[in-house]
Amino acid sequence: MTLLLDTTIPRTLDVLLARFAQRPATRVEAWLFEDEAARREAEAVLAGSGTEARLYSAYKPLLHHFLETVAPARPRRVTVRTPAGDFARFRLEAYPLAALLPDTALSFVPGELPLAYEVDLDGQVQRVFVPHRAGAQGGSCGWLRVWEGEALVEDGPLETEFEQAYQAVMAAVGAHAWPAAAPYFGTLQIEVETGGIERRLPWQDECLSTREALHEEFYFAILAGFQQRAGKPDGDRTLQPGQIVPLLRAGSGDTHVRVSVLPLAPAAPEPAPASVPVPAEAAPGGLAAAIAPLTPAQADAAMAALGGEPFLHASTQGRPVRGAYFAGAGPALVVTGGQHANETSGVVGALRAAQALKQRGAHFAVVASENPDGAALHQRLRQDHARHMLHAARYTALGDDLEARQAPPYGEKGARLEAIARTSARLHLSLHGYPAHEWTRPLNGYVPHGFSQWTIPKGFFLILRYHAGLDGTAFLDTLTARLAADPELAAFNAAQLAVWDAHAGELPFAARHGIPCMLMEDHRSTVPFTLVTEFPDQTVYGAAFRLAHTTHMRTVLHAAELLQEGWLS
């Protein structure tokens, strides 16, 4: 192990309390990455020492303003003028306000104030300060205002522990002498124990979490740094830097940060599939009851139990990547799940679909869990943060997107390639998910770079890729009509699309029968048609998880029927 950083950062709130206990001010306003309870307690302490204080959230300040002061009043009409500049960003930063005010006529219009929202509540106008740094990134930041008598003597950014932890990690990673070429490390582990905001919201799976935001900042910023180091283009998915693992833990008081480089670790030995005690939800016929992601061992056992002609490949860390081929009748298809391992419902959907296709005597191959190393990391991270997106588990243990591998050794991708070769499939169904609650990068422009279309949920949607000269429009129109016949899915999509419209505006691609659909000519696969399913499944459990994998399964089965009927001939 190589230690890059081991440091402690004082809690900004405690620093302020100590400062104004020693020398009280007339009035203080501060914006911090702290939850409401901690801020209110600190206000009382400051008042006791002679300082009038009001402490606000630096993260999503307009939303917190409504949660903490406006929502109980239930206004009938609200008009929000966003800060000058990036209208789309500041409208998104207010999400999911539209869902939390269902009986309120809410509208957003571009404003002119540089660092504030202007909010009209039934004719009463309020200003809500929005601390963020100038420049292209426009990151959220702490802020401090201090009055001595009537004089404002301090008014500017306050570097909080949230920001300092991020900067310390990025500086340590940037200063290290890395190898000249990838892979740069086995595992780059970032351990942070810190306080902050962790608040569930009363709208579907929405939550506010500064620790989740730090996870996302660390993972994507570090990955982008190594892409630049390697001379890769923006958004590249081929680089294999190693596995980046942010470990965020809840703490109180000071923030502790530790960054270390570890060798690539092989997977711990797992029992043979036949000896795994498979729970009822992973047993054939019982997957319909699944309300949570399967473990890698459970998914492997369920794949082994399918039958058919098995084939086996190995992951980077040595885990089995299992496939099964069924030489049935009719045109062939391939079904895969778990390419991105934090998108968990597709694994169950693929297994359920495979069971049904087998009973129908269909011609197909299935690889239900393509990325077991990522799944193992997701299982590990989920122990601490079951409701976080955990994008560090998205890619393989080498740090790349397995679909992007274009040359041997193919590793995990070998199972997909064998499934395609065995079937000569005309259609590949790749079952995916995306965040079920808002995805933010508050220190780097707020909206995740390269993922602006994925930042808030827009319901279940489809992406159809096709080779030049082909047309899947009629297929997609018929498929969505059949899928929309499920009233639960239809209601789910309608609710999410209404909130999307309020906070993001027009969809980036048209909806068919209430299901957004993207069509694109694409040649990344040898299969003529690739249908990607996208359900907002990251972090969901219970009935929402069941709807997710049921929708994946229904999509596969309806698509197989349409393929059989000649809609993709």
Label for each model-derived stretch:
Residues 1-293, 422-423, 442-569:
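C-terminal accessory segments enriched in acidic
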Residues 277-330:
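Soluble metallo-hydrolase cores and metallopeptidase-like ectodomains found primarily
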Residues 310, 322-323, 416-417, 518-522:
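Generic recognition of flexible, low-complexity loop/linker segments
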Residues 330-332, 528:
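Conserved catalytic motifs of the protein kinase core domain
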Residues 331, 344-349, 359-470:
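Active-site/substrate-binding loop(s) of hydrolase catalytic cores
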Residues 334-337:
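Short hydrophobic beta-strand that contains or immediately precedes a catalytic carboxylate
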Residues 345-354, 358-408, 509-569:
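Mobile, glycine- and charge-enriched loop segments
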